[in-house]
């Protein structure tokens, strides 16, 4: 019978050409069309089958596939638990097909015969087909029968193997180690996969466990696949996702009215904040400060908001000077604290200035962040001057100090304080060639601003004619372990550009540190902060000779005052830098001693080496009456006194 099938295949397709079956593998099969039996008879002898021979060739093709599968599945062996139904079907099919080739009986020309042949083949495939090579039983069925055949209703793994080889004809010649690896692995897999089998510990030592049938029945089929906990099937995540879905539905069904509301439209985007629950949203928003922190980008704060909740990942490691290895974690005072210290009449202008400054924070000149040393570096202030958006610290409403009141300065101060943490100017490390005065651990120490200092400064020395003591919140709020004073800028920029005398409204507050490091007066340019930490770059560097040269210290922001007199906090002033007597010639007296550095450095958190700054900056100030013993600095010595005109410094 197999030989006849092979001969038929050779007759039908000698050159292995594809059979002409326009609708193969479809149901119902196309109806055969034979106009006359003579034409069909003549076409059978042709080597290439025609379309009119289609039903016969289709049935033969199905029949040949059946024979080939049976030849592969060991046709000499009989199935284990099958009746002779398959052989009967096979014989019936060939009894129908062989006469059709020899005699061309008109039965095949009728659609009923072709449909019967196809139905018989389909029945063989569906109901009686063997799922495995040994028959219709699965591995689990064979294992179940093996365990049930044992007298104790339990078998070890090796006994199950032996039963397979003895009882199943397919495994008789597959008992050796080479050919049994595959099916034995399947046996072990099914034993552990199905819940119908249970493992019982063997009493004897060194013996394998017993495998028994589950007395509770168990599942006859496959149990669900066990998966590791992931984002998809984790119960905690599923609960949070369910809560998020409920909240999103509640938001969509809110007063704005279903899907027509903007919140519902944007909430359908899976990456939007509306599609996350509150638990996930905190982690979702925490990526910004970590990936865009100043410590990693060196481009200043990028987000136009004051983030009071940044963790240690945003702490700025500023200057690798001796002894400066700690992180500063104190933050800016909140908006409510600063607003409380301002005059009510100036609060509206303050908010307008803040809104204007928020649009100017993205650094237009990435080249300003490059490291540099010495006083010859081109000042980023000129780049800031060239870019139209770089005046975040010059309030638009401030024109001249002589026409401004104390509230105007407070507006400047608040704009400075609010934007100080978002300074667009990057930080720059001190040059390594700087003479480090305290090598190793011999530092003057980090001067700490106490927690109660803010409230104390808000209420101390608050004379009406003075600049507000709450400015100390701007100065003393800089990093909690640092004594670096960051005086706010002066609002008298325009008059100083003209060279005329004016009041210097910048602060030097000698009283606010209470015996700690004196807040060095820094030349302030009306644009940005000049932190004390950077004075040690080139204290004796540029002079006022060329107008820009005194301001070209690393980040000299006053370089735009070509030939002008940049305002600054003078140490010889009365501590607040106030009074009409503070004229331009007094400012010239100390301008060359106090270079302007790092004008855009954020004052929120940073480190500074107070010892190096005091040594490099204040020791060479000729007009400063400053008493400092360099021999004791190795032991963390604080300077005994720094004399100004009205205040004296006493070490704490």
Curated annotation (Swiss-Prot):
InterPro entries: FH_FOXO1 (IPR047408), Fork_head_dom (IPR001766), FOXO-TAD (IPR032067), FOXO_KIX-bd (IPR032068), TF_fork_head_CS_2 (IPR030456), WH-like_DNA-bd_sf (IPR036388), WH_DNA-bd_sf (IPR036390). Residues 238-249 have a biased composition (Basic residues). Signal peptide: none annotated. GO terms for molecular function: DNA-binding transcription factor activity, RNA polymerase II-specific; RNA polymerase II cis-regulatory region sequence-specific DNA binding. GO terms for cellular component: cytoplasm; nucleus. Residues 41-57 have a biased composition (Polar residues). Residues 362-397 have a biased composition (Low complexity). Its main location: cytoplasm. Residues 134-228 bind DNA. Pfam families: Forkhead (PF00250), FOXO-TAD (PF16676), FOXO_KIX_bdg (PF16675). Keywords: Cytoplasm, DNA-binding, Nucleus, Transcription, Transcription regulation. Residues 1-57, 208-277, 359-406 are annotated as: Disordered. GO terms for biological process: gluconeogenesis; lymph vessel development; regulation of transcription by RNA polymerase II; smooth muscle cell differentiation; smooth muscle cell proliferation; smooth muscle tissue development. It is found in: Cytoplasm; Nucleus. Transcription factor that regulates metabolic homeostasis in response to oxidative stress. Binds to the consensus sequence 5'-TT[G/A]TTTTG-3' and the related Daf-16 family binding element (DBE) with consensus sequence 5'-TT[G/A]TTTAC-3'. Main regulator of redox balance and osteoblast numbers and controls bone mass. Orchestrates the endocrine function of the skeleton in regulating glucose metabolism. May be involved in regulating cellular homeostasis in the eye. This is Forkhead box protein O1-A.
């Amino acid at each position: 019978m197999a030989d006849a099938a092979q001969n038929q295949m050779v007759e039908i397709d000698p050159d292995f050409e594809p059979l002409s079956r326009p609708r193969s593998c479809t149901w119902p099969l196309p109806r055969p069309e034979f106009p006359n039996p003579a034409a069909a008879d003549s076409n059978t002898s042709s080597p290439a089958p025609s379309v009119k021979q289609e039903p016969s060739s289709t049935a033969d093709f199905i029949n040949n596939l059946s024979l080939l599968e049976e030849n592969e599945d060991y046709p000499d062996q009989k199935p284990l638990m099958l009746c002779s139904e398959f052989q009967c079907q096979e014989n019936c099919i060939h009894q129908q097909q062989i006469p059709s080739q020899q005699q061309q009986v008109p039965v095949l020309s009728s659609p009923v015969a072709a449909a019967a042949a196809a139905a018989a083949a389909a029945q063989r495939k569906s109901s009686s087909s063997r799922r495995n090579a040994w028959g219709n039983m699965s591995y689990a069925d064979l294992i179940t029968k093996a365990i049930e055949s044992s007298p104790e209703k339990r078998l070890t793994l090796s006994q199950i193997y032996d039963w397979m080889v003895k009882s199943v004809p397919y495994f008789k010649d597959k008992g050796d180690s080479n050919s049994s690896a595959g099916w034995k692995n399947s046996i072990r897999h099914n034993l552990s996969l199905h819940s119908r089998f249970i493992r019982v510990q063997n009493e004897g030592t060194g013996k394998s466990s017993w495998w028994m049938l589950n007395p509770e029945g168990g599942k006859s089929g496959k149990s669900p696949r066990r998966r590791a906990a992931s984002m998809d099937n984790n119960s905690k995540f599923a609960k949070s996702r369910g809560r998020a879905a409920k909240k999103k539905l509640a938001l969509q069904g809110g007063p704005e009215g279903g899907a027509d509301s903007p919140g519902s439209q944007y909430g359908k985007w899976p990456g939007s904040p509306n599609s996350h629950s509150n638990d996930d949203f905190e982690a979702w928003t925490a990526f910004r400060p970590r990936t865009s922190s100043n410590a990693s980008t060196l481009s200043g704060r990028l987000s136009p908001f004051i983030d009071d909740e940044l963790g240690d990942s945003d702490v700025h490691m500023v200057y690798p000077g001796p002894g400066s290895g700690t992180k500063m974690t104190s933050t800016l005072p909140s908006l409510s604290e600063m607003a409380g210290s301002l005059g009510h009449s100036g609060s509206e202008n303050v908010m307008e200035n803040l809104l204007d400054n928020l649009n100017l924070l993205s650094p237009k000149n990435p080249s300003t962040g490059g490291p540099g040393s010495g006083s010859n570096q081109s000042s980023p202030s000129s780049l800031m001057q060239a870019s139209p958006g770089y005046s975040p610290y010059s309030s638009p409403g401030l024109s001249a100090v002589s026409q401004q009141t104390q509230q105007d300065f407070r507006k400047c101060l608040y704009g400075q304080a609010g934007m100080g943490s978002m300074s667009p100017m990057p930080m720059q490390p001190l040059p390594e060639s700087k003479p480090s005065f305290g090598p190793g651990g011999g530092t003057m120490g980090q001067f700490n601003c106490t927690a109660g200092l803010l409230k104390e400064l808000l209420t101390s020395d608050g004379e009406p004619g003075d600049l507000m003591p709450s400015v100390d919140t701007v100065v003393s709020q800089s990093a909690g372990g640092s004594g670096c004073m960051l005086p706010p800028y002066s609002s008298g920029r325009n008059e100083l550009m003209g060279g005329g005398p004016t009041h210097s409204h910048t602060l030097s507050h000698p009283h606010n540190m209470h015996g700690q490091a004196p807040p060095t007066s820094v030349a302030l340019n009306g644009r940005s902060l000049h932190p004390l930490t950077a004075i040690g770059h080139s204290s004796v560097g540029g002079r006022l000779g060329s107008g820009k040269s005194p301001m070209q210290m690393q980040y000299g922001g006053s370089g735009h005052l070509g030939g002008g007199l940049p305002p600054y906090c003078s140490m010889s002033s009365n501590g607040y830098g106030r009074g009409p007597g503070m004229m331009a010639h007094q400012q010239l007296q100390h301008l060359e001693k106090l270079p302007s550095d790092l004008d855009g450095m954020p004052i929120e958190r940073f480190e500074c080496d107070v010892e190096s700054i005091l040594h490099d900056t204040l020791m060479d100030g000729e007009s400063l009456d400053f008493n400092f013993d360099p021999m004791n600095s190795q032991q963390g010595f604080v300077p005994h006194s720094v004399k100004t005109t009205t205040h004296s410094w006493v070490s704490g």
